Amino acid sequence: MNTNKALFLDRDGIINIDKGYVSQKEDFEFQKGIFELLKHAKSLGYKLLLITNQSGINRGYYTLKDFEQLTQYLQESLFKELGFNLDGIYFCRHAPEENCACRKPKPSLILQAAKEHQICLEQSFMIGDKESDMLAGLNAKVKNNLLLIQNPLKTPHSWIQCKDFKEMIDLIK
């Protein structure tokens, strides 16, 4: 039975500032407000699951080992700052033209994470900064989809647009 709730989190643009194909810890900078968001969600019992497209691997911009080392740095930094880690890391290494089954906006990474962590999608949130993040959430049937964006988009979709993490914290109960 799926009884856990989760925050499905994009990495670049949500966890860290998106500087384009971030692969080294020297280039990794946490987003302002992300620690507060993660702490709030964790205190309410949410699992924290990273869902990220990392096409830089297959494009040859960086290696799988680079990604794994940066992910280890991310986890160690979170533990040092907050006393906990992300509960799961799910990534797609493919470029869009490879037409794989795992790249957002396809839902398979979210569905895999939900299955492995017994997540109730009705009680969960997808948090991202791009349309592909929101569409992945919608395609996976995640009930709540929060888009971090400074300039609101006109969209027929049911996601909620937030200008900062404070707005998101107020929505996550």
From Swiss-Prot:
Amino acids binding Zn(2+): C92, H94, C100, C102
Q: Where does substrate bind?
A: D10, R11, D12, D18, K19, G20, Y21, T52, N53, Q54, S55, R103, K104, K130
Site positions (Contributes to substrate recognition) are: R103
Q: Where in the cell is it found?
A: Cytoplasm
Task: Provide the binding site for Mg(2+).
Answer: D10, D12, D129, K130
> Per the record, what are the reactions this protein catalyses?
D-glycero-beta-D-manno-heptose 1,7-bisphosphate + H2O = D-glycero-beta-D-manno-heptose 1-phosphate + phosphate
The entry sums up its family as follows: Belongs to the GmhB family.
Q: Give the protein name, as stated in the record.
A: D-glycero-beta-D-manno-heptose-1,7-bisphosphate 7-phosphatase
